[in-house]
Swiss-Prot record:
Pro residues composition bias: residue spans: 736-756
Gene Ontology terms: cellular component: Atg1/ULK1 kinase complex; cytosol; phagophore assembly site
Keywords per UniProt: Autophagy, Cytoplasm, Protein transport, Transport
InterPro entries in the cross-refs: ATG13, Atg13_N, HORMA_dom_sf
Gene source species: Aspergillus niger (strain ATCC MYA-4892 / CBS 513.88 / FGSC A1513)
Biased composition (Basic and acidic residues): 357-367, 883-892
Compositionally biased tracts (Polar residues): 50-59, 547-559, 833-848, 894-903
Gene designation per UniProt: atg13
Protein name: Autophagy-related protein 13
Lineage per the UniProt record: Eukaryota, Fungi, Dikarya, Ascomycota, Pezizomycotina
Amino acid sequence: MHQHPRSPAPAAPPSASRPGANRSDDRPNSPAFDPRVQLTRGLGIETEARSSGQTSSSRPAKEAISKLNQLVTNYHTKAALVILASRIDLTRSDDTPKINPKVNRWFAIDLEDIDALREQLRFWRINDVSEQPPPPLIIETYLDTKDLTNNQSLVALDEQGKRFDVLESLSRSSEAHAKGPVSSRSEDVILERWRVELGNTPNKALPADLGSILPKIYKQSIVTFRTLFTYSKLLPAWKLAKRNGRLHAHPALQIRYRILAGKPNPDDSRPDRLTTPLFDSSNKVVETYTFGTTESPVGYLSIQVTYRTSCEFRVDDSEALLSSRFMGADDEVFRPSLPSRESNLKAANSGVGSAPVEKRTVEDPDPSRAYGSLSTFHHVGPTTSASPISALRAARESGAASPSPPSSSSRKPVEVVKASPLGRAAVLANESSPGVARRSSISFPPFKAPPLSASPSLVDPPLGMSPRSGTMTRPQFPESKNMPPPSMAASARKSLPLPGASETTATSSNSASPRPTPIARYSSAFTHRRGRPSSGNINRIDDENSSGKTSATSSNPQPGSGLLAEATGTSADSIHADDENITEFLKMLDLRKDLLRTSNSASADVTARRTTATSAALTRFQRMRDSNAQLSESMSSSMLLQRSSTSSSKQLSGVPPMVAGTSISTASSPGKPISPHTPHTPAIPSRLSSNSIVDYGNERGREQPSSVGDYTPEGPTIPHRPSVVTVNAIDIPTSPGLPFPPYRRPSSAAPPPPPVATDDDEIFPFNLRSVSLGAEERSHNSLSALQRQHDLEGAKSNTQPTRREQRPPLASEDPSRRSSSTGHGTSPHKRTSLSGPTVAPSPSNNHVYQPRFSLCRGRGLSGGPHSLSSGSSSLARGAPSDLAERDHDRDVNASGSNSGTSTVEDRRAAGRRPSSGRNIPPPSQVEEDEPLLFAMSDFGASRRSFEEGRHGNHGRRL
């Protein structure tokens, strides 16, 4: 037992002369000091009273008496350590913290022994119980209000959460009982008072076998201290201490303690700070608990605690406390005479023989019914008027009479349906007072076509509906309708069979006035074929169609539009009728027979889902049709504009860029006119056409050496015809959006067209060519060969001016040669040199390009009337007028072209622009082109070297 031997005590005096023989006479006869009155409380550890005649002639040993003193001393000190360690951090009060603190292991509880507490308990540690027992150990825990500032107040909270000023309550109690000035201790709020006491047994001497009794006393004390250790952490003061430790509360809320010796002075007139009530309450202010008594040879050892039952304290602002006091006074003075809202809810929920149903009034709606639709007011509550338009409609129908504010007895209960996987359902019960009737409202949603997901079923009963939630039968009054969220698709709703005609036109038999026909109870899986209900107005369907309640894709009402939550009036004699409640329950069971048929509901669900999916797909593709058409037009326009900007940038700076010829695509094959019936209309040049051009380049290389010899001075007749003309390129037509009249595309099985139809002017009604041709469209002759050809052909050009202008086209002329002339536009300078409007513009293309354009058309075509031919512009820039005339004569002789007009060309020229070398332009056309002409002096001789360099570069790349 960790007891150290002590020297034997001196012989005890006779019992008659012991100073403790008359201890019972010195103590007052009070229940607090007499442990015998506590026999029914605590642990009940005590023994029977020994007979008064039992005496011991022998004295106990000195060592046994020392062990008894040690047991009593540790009983007091360990009780104080257990009590204070659970409420106060004693380690902070220790001035000299130790690395290896001393542990107190008495009574099988290990706690750190604090030196500061040892000093405060020194009087109980040095006392000798054999001579004089120690006084009672009093430990008080309290709150000190000295740390509060002037604008802070310590408040106590009652069971309802009301605040009361603690100092004010203590001051009133002190002034009522005090005869003198109030001491400073009135600022303390005592929370607990612990009492550890050694009670004296009268006429009791120490037994001779004291050493054998002490172990039994120690074991009994272990049980007491275990109980103390546990119960001390269940009292309200311990909870306050833990809450302050977590929240780092105000210093005024920190629990303090003080240790007193003896009992309070009974003559003190001041009231006890522990038992003073801080606020009015029906509960006890304090309670007392005794941990039992342990009998010892020197008396009864006992531990008792008196504690406050309410320790809810906090520090608040004084002004806020004063304001709350005024508000509390207003609540008491201006208390309404009508019953409260909570009492009405309890009365409405109370029912006999049914499950509890949660109901809410119109003034107290369910927050879960808040719906963020544009057609609602974004409010929480029953949608009596779902939109401003419906509110005006309802006001117009109800008349000019203003309704009176509803009283507490006429509130309309609102059924709140619990949330479910299918969504929240807002249910309006048609229960009202006898004098109040609710009119149906018609809503006009702002959108004509609601989304597909906003197509709920109208007749599914609420998921949490009680059998007695409604008063009317379902065929007569659709009392509740689902209000699913907008994300709920129509396919998630189950459909029911269509009702009979008698059910849809049913009226109430116990109502004096006819009621409007309710909304259809059943919903078909084909929601777009469901008929619109009537609400007593023959123009209801027309109004709904004009207001946007129906659409091409879905005729279901939009959530929040008010149609799902329309309420109809009820009569006074149908409220809270038990027989009608039973009837309603039976009707509901009859209507929901499909719950037992899972296959039918599953098939209906699949059908509804399939119908909705089909409708959604059709709607999506219908909307995509217009957008795709617009996208196609936009892409075509952008490609045409891009090619126009690209080709116009390659032209000369003096030519206007917005020429119709600059947007021609070169994807079409030669000899095939562009027709609006072309099956393929790519806006991007095709690589197939480019490949065909490259393939024909091989033939072009074989034909090139004979190009010089073809032009002889004897005449324009060409002796031989290239064999590659019979091969046609792959036809990849261009975009149909070109600014020329449509041409019919010839069939591939038809015979070859006449030479006139294969002319390039038929395909491209433009007579000019861009300056910047690609590398594959240029010839590869050297500059000396070009000059030699120019000299040979210029010698014969002066002798044929008249015959050049009037010679008709030869029937045997090579169409490829004629097409080559159209590949190059006439020079504006030559056009100005001709006198008279009847003179046709002569082709000015160089013969160098003839083999190339006899095969296929190049990518550099820009048939605008203001484009210049690269061949003519590169040789005739800056030349005098006689040289230009010689070039003009030479080109006519070489290409075999003349200014005559054939019969076929006359017919075709009526609907298109004039072609170079074929048709005589009208005077208006010549006059139109006059402001756009430019002088040849704008182009210097340096341009010729630039073209020569480009010829060389392109030749090397090929």
